[in-house]
């Protein structure tokens, strides 16, 4: 019996003000857990898989049922502990403590290998939580669309005089994270050709408006890119195929995209990357019968994929790793210069991290889109001079379809997050919003992750692999009063390559919530400024001084 498969269930978060838990502080994690498994949100909800290969919301269906039952009974001075998707304890704490503490996929470093994780996973002792799957704050592809948009815009500034009009981007992967790429590209003014091996993913991105159309052949896709370059009208096109075949073919043809990247689930060579020449049926069967053969074949294919990216890079085409660890996988198979092209964080995003700017997000527990539109307006009111942010919010309202509970992603930093959170809480208190909102973020943030091949790649002081920082971030968020806090391993880049922390706080309109929000939404981004100031980044040092952070190791 497969305890992780239930084709008879359809999970959707409740809407409205009626709650089945004892307070909004426990109703909120209940709804967000359920929202992660909404069919409009999750990739394979019947298997509890939310996104990112096998990133799950709960370890198995029995654990899911026990978590939901525990949340409904939880008192406002109790804390539920989750160990890799399984509820293991309820303890008396206090009203300002987190209601839920989550640890996912954490393994003692010497044993933190994919093989050992898979053994534990098969035994039912662990699950892969990715970043926001197991921490219950995934909001669909919107969750990464602004970060991807900001990256593409910055590429345009650096390489193309500030405009991507008439340019096109080559990428692969249209899963939960990669599915944001086509919309991010067209919002940034560029066209995109996205290669995807699974028809269902292309269909989902078409259905949700993230992808404009599908091409039947590579020739058709290239013709569309050529026409869009002439007209300077941005369009996104999905092509069913394998990137390990399509990317090298484009190199052979002498085709020159304007930007090259990739968001396949290469971090998981068994469950996330289809080997070249294999059918989906072959892949699925072999994953169960001979996972090592799948891993070898996948990594061999990644070598061809990355070599093509290196070839584009050698031609002077901006080429970037978008954080799926594909360079590492190729290097492991003998491609020595796999890291010749950069990751997106050191190349384009780190200056934002130095100021604590990152993927702030919130979701309306009412289920009413109007609550999000009202909060959009409040963000504009409180940040009247940030025209770039206003433009983002306008485009998001016009072009992003909500998946599950209505939500918004909005990159803001230290000094702004707590102001927005307090304003949202006041809107709930005054009845301007129909129900409370939850405020969280991706684990991909300035102070909450150690990932030497992604967020902390090429740190100025060489501290790429120091993972004290996400541990401190999680501990501080617990002490500050976040509603739930998570500490994960392996998200984004795979087992053995990252540690990271998440937090969510509920704005329920109470004065007590306001105090917690003020602490959490100041302290959380401040750890990012602290981390980068400690590494010697002048932007972060200046920000720390400007914001009055007390950093004892920072010279006065």
Curated annotation (Swiss-Prot):
The active site is at residue 410. One of its GO terms (biological process) is L-histidine catabolic process to glutamate and formate. Binds 1 NAD(+) per subunit. GO terms for molecular function: urocanate hydratase activity. Belongs to the urocanase family. Its main location: cytoplasm. Pfam families: Urocanase, Urocanase_C, Urocanase_N. Keywords: Cytoplasm, Histidine metabolism, Lyase, NAD. GO terms for cellular component: cytoplasm. The lineage of its organism: Bacteria, Pseudomonadati, Pseudomonadota, Alphaproteobacteria, Hyphomicrobiales. It comes from Bradyrhizobium diazoefficiens (strain JCM 10833 / BCRC 13528 / IAM 13628 / NBRC 14792 / USDA 110). This is Urocanate hydratase.
């Amino acid at each position: 019996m497969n305890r992780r498969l239930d084709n008879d269930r359809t999970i959707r978060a409740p809407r409205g003000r009626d709650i089945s838990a004892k307070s909004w502080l426990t109703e909120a994690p209940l709804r967000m857990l359920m929202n992660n498994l909404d069919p409009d949100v999750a990739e394979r909800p019947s298997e509890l898989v939310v996104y990112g290969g096998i990133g799950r919301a709960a370890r198995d269906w029995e654990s899911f049922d026990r978590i939901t039952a525990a949340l409904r009974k939880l008192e406002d001075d109790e804390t539920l502990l989750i160990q890799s998707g399984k509820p293991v304890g309820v303890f008396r704490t206090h009203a300002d403590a987190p209601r839920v503490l989550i640890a996912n996929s954490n393994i003692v470093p010497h044993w933190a290998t994919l093989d050992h994780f898979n053994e534990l996973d098969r035994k039912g002792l662990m699950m892969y939580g990715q970043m926001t799957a197991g921490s219950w704050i995934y909001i669909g592809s919107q969750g990464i669309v602004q970060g991807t948009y900001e990256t593409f815009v910055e590429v345009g500034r650096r390489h193309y005089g500030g405009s991507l009009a008439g340019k096109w981007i080559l990428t692969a992967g249209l899963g939960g994270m990669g599915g944001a790429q086509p919309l991010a590209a067209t919002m940034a003014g560029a066209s995109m050709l996205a290669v995807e091996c699974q028809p269902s993913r292309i269909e989902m991105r078409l259905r949700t408006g993230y992808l404009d159309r599908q091409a039947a052949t590579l020739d058709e896709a290239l013709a569309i890119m050529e026409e869009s370059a002439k007209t300077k009208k941005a369009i996104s096109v999905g092509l069913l195929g394998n990137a390990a075949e399509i990317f090298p073919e484009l190199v052979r043809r002498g085709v020159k995209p304007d930007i090259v990247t990739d968001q396949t689930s290469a971090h998981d060579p068994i469950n996330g990357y289809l080997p070249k020449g294999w059918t989906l049926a072959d892949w699925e069967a072999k994953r169960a019968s001979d996972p090592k053969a799948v891993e070898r074949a996948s990594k061999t294919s990644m070598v061809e994929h990355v070599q093509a990216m290196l070839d584009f890079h050698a031609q002077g085409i901006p080429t970037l790793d978008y954080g799926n660890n594909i360079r590492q996988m190729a290097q492991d198979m003998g491609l020595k210069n796999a890291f010749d092209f950069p990751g997106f964080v050191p190349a384009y995003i780190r200056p934002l991290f130095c100021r604590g700017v990152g993927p702030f997000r919130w979701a309306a527990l009412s289920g009413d889109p109007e609550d999000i539109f009202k909060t959009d307006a409040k963000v504009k009111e409180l940040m009247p001079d940030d025209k770039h942010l206003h433009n983002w919010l306008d485009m998001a309202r016009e072009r992003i379809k909500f998946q599950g509970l209505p939500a918004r992603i909005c990159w803001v930093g230290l000094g702004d997050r707590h102001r927005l959170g307090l304003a949202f809480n006041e809107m709930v208190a005054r009845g301007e919003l129909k129900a409370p909102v939850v405020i969280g973020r991706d684990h991909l943030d300035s102070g909450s992750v150690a990932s030497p091949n992604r967020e902390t790649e090429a740190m100025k002081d060489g501290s790429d692999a120091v993972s004290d920082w996400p541990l401190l971030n999680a501990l501080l968020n617990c002490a500050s009063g976040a509603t739930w806090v998570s500490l994960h391993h392996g998200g984004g880049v795979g087992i053995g390559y990252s540690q990271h922390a998440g937090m969510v706080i509920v704005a329920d309109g109470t004065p007590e919530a306001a105090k917690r929000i003020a602490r959490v939404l100041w302290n959380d981004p401040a750890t990012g400024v602290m981390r980068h100031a400690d590494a010697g980044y002048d932007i972060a040092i200046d920000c720390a001084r400007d914001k009055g952070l007390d950093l004892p190791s920072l010279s006065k």
